[in-house]
């Protein structure tokens, strides 16, 4: 069972997010879209890695 705390950001993560928000306020639209697409790609790769790790750990 997943701990509900896993869905909350740590204080360090909240600070990191705030720093990124300030940094990206200055980006133009094209830079913002490029960053968003790059971030989504990284999230998809991470999801694939997690899925693969889970699949391999369940096999005998």
Curated annotation (Swiss-Prot):
Please state the span of the N-terminal signal peptide per the UniProt entry. none
Q: Which SUPFAM superfamilies match?
A: NblA-like
User: What is the similarity comment for this entry?
Assistant: To Synechococcus PCC 7942 NblA and some, to chloroplast ycf18.
Q: Which Gene3D superfamilies match?
A: Phycobilisome degradation protein NblA
What is the official name of this protein in its record?
A: Phycobilisome degradation protein NblA homolog 2
Source species, domain of life: Bacteria
Which InterPro entries is this protein grouped with?
Answer: NblA, NblA_sf
């Amino acid at each position: 069972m997943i701990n509900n705390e896993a869905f909350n950001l740590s204080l360090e993560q909240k600070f990191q997010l705030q720093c990124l928000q300030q940094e990206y306020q200055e980006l133009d639209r094209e830079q913002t879209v490029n960053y968003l697409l790059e971030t989504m790609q990284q999230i998809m790769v991470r999801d694939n890695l997690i899925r693969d790790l889970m699949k391999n750990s369940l096999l005998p």
